[in-house]
Amino acid sequence: MTEFELPPKYITAANDLRSDTFTTPTAEMMEAALEASIGDAVYGEDVDTVRLEQTVARMAGKEAGLFCVSGTLSNQIAIRTHLMQPPYSILCDYRAHVYTHEAAGLAILSQAMVVPVVPSNGDYLTLEDIKSHYVPDDGDIHGAPTRLISLENTLHGIVYPLEELVRIKAWCMENGLKLHCDGARIWNAAAQSGVPLKQYGEIFDSISICLSKSMGAPIGSVLVGNLKFVKKATHFRKQQGGGIRQSGMMARMALVNINNDWKSQLLYSHSLAHELAEYCEAKGIPLESPADTNFVFINLKAARMDPDVLVKKGLKYNVKLMGGRVSFHYQVTRDTLEKVKLAISEAFDYAKEHPFDCNGPTQIYRSESTEVDVDGNAIREIKTYKY
């Protein structure tokens, strides 16, 4: 019998900077799972799942929560729940996860036209950006009126200024628009800014709150909103195959970090990112965005850096990178930080002698997690990913 082709065994997240999704369950989480409730969550009978939903909803100042297997699912069913009869359009940042990384879900599930907007300040959408791309429901039959604004906090690691969110919310209320937040990393925004989740909840009609990124849970997201909204969203979760039976184990594991000092964990990861950003700036390595939280985005195009070379340099030091997108989480060690500094510095120096042509077909992120030879070159071909 031919053996299955399996990936290498995953050992540790301490050297993995590809994404904050690579956090691994702690011993405390594994122990908690053994004591989890075993009710049927599809019928609303699982105690720990309900406890998780209510806990996150209350933290965000919302009436109800809905546990979903992923942020993609919670985003998509949230937007679908807000929308009624097409034609309509959704307005979001051109880099938004709901637009670029969710397999055309908005077009397929919500039948919506998406209006992607480039922020005029380069970092986040302002009210003026939104107004200039808003499609009014003014009787013009050629357009698809804007019904919903979707904002991401954080996006590219940038914390959305609270005062700008307040301005956008007021305008949405004046114009009868729903405001959704992809809060995959809203925990990071709350920790860094000091703005409580409840205050964000007062601004948005719905928030998708991820549990499996910086928070470290193995799976899941909680969609929060008012009771009527969540009741309807439950139908769409079922329709999309997202109902889970005994989800208590996953819920119990997620509650471990929520009930612990999650802010300190996140701020630790932010401090590593801040230190790397300062190092890059001191070396003259250009960055794409401010390193507000746990991400450092190296401007590979401006630096003429080859992302494959950067990945290989990381592997030389046993650090896993995803191109110029360096993502920190609470399980990354300071030793890894020092190693990634060396990898980036060497890739930058290499680019000075061998500038990379960035004008061909581009990919957003590149990654490889295989072994390397003595020179730091990957043994297997570098794999290219969008996310």
Swiss-Prot record:
Domain of life: Eukaryota
UniProt keyword annotation of Ubl conjugation present: yes
Class in the EC hierarchy, top level: lyase
Stored Pfam families: Beta_elim_lyase
Keyword annotations: Isopeptide bond, Lyase, Phosphoprotein, Pyridoxal phosphate, Ubl conjugation
Essential cofactor(s): pyridoxal 5'-phosphate
Recorded metabolic or biological pathway in which this protein acts: Amino-acid biosynthesis; glycine biosynthesis; glycine from L-allo-threonine: step 1/1; Amino-acid degradation; L-threonine degradation via aldolase pathway; acetaldehyde and glycine from L-threonine: step 1/1
SUPFAM superfamilies in the cross-refs: PLP-dependent transferases
Phosphothreonine sites (modified residues): T370
UniProt entry tagged with the keyword Transcription: no
GO cellular component: cytosol
E.C. code: 4.1.2.48
Catalysed reaction, written as an equation: L-threonine = acetaldehyde + glycine; L-allo-threonine = acetaldehyde + glycine
Family assignment from sequence similarity: Belongs to the threonine aldolase family.
The protein's assembly and partners: Homotetramer.
Job of this protein: Catalyzes the cleavage of L-allo-threonine and L-threonine to glycine and acetaldehyde.
Miscellaneous information on this protein: Present with 106000 molecules/cell in log phase SD medium.
Protein name: Low specificity L-threonine aldolase
UniProt source species: Saccharomyces cerevisiae (strain ATCC 204508 / S288c)
Gene: GLY1
